[in-house]
Amino acid sequence: MKKHGMLNSHIAKVLADLGHTDLIAIADAGLPVPDGAPKIDLSLTAGVPAFRDVTSLVAGEMAVEKVIAASEIKDANPENASFIESHFSAQTIEYMSHEEFKRLTQKAKAVIRTGEMTPYANCILQAGVIF
């Protein structure tokens, strides 16, 4: 049995398989997952697990080069927008329209669905390298 780090075997495998510039999406409960995109559904009930918790844990297990979010989060969900800005202050943060964001999830190696029930609480983490 694994003792440390990411215990969810599906997420651990995706993280281990990431290469430079690969994408992994962390989504609220309402984000549509494109057909064919691998979905890891962690949602248990409204708000559990939270977007911030899942994002922090996943990001802590990988080299993050860039974070992508919908520009709408800034006005519709300032608390989670502030979280993204502060948690990823050392990384590039790119904003795009929610429609563009949804299209980009088609390229994600996985979409991790949380129980988050606040608007636009989604981000895409682009893998960096550790050397």
Curated annotation (Swiss-Prot):
Keywords: Carbohydrate metabolism, Cytoplasm, Isomerase. It is an enzyme of class 5 (isomerase). GO terms for molecular function: D-ribose pyranase activity; intramolecular lyase activity; monosaccharide binding. Substrate binds at residues 28, 98, 120-122. It catalyses: beta-D-ribopyranose = beta-D-ribofuranose. InterPro entries: D-ribose_pyranase, RbsD-like_sf, RbsD_FucU. It is found in: Cytoplasm. It comes from the Bacteria. Coiled coil: none annotated. The active site is at 20 (proton donor). GO terms for cellular component: cytosol. It holds the Pfam family RbsD_FucU. Its main location: cytoplasm. Transmembrane segments: none annotated. Pathway: Carbohydrate metabolism; D-ribose degradation; D-ribose 5-phosphate from beta-D-ribopyranose: step 1/2. GO terms for biological process: D-ribose catabolic process. Its EC number is 5.4.99.62. Belongs to the RbsD / FucU family. RbsD subfamily. Homodecamer. NCBIfam families: PRK11797.1 (NF008761). Catalyzes the interconversion of beta-pyran and beta-furan forms of D-ribose. This is D-ribose pyranase. The gene is rbsD.
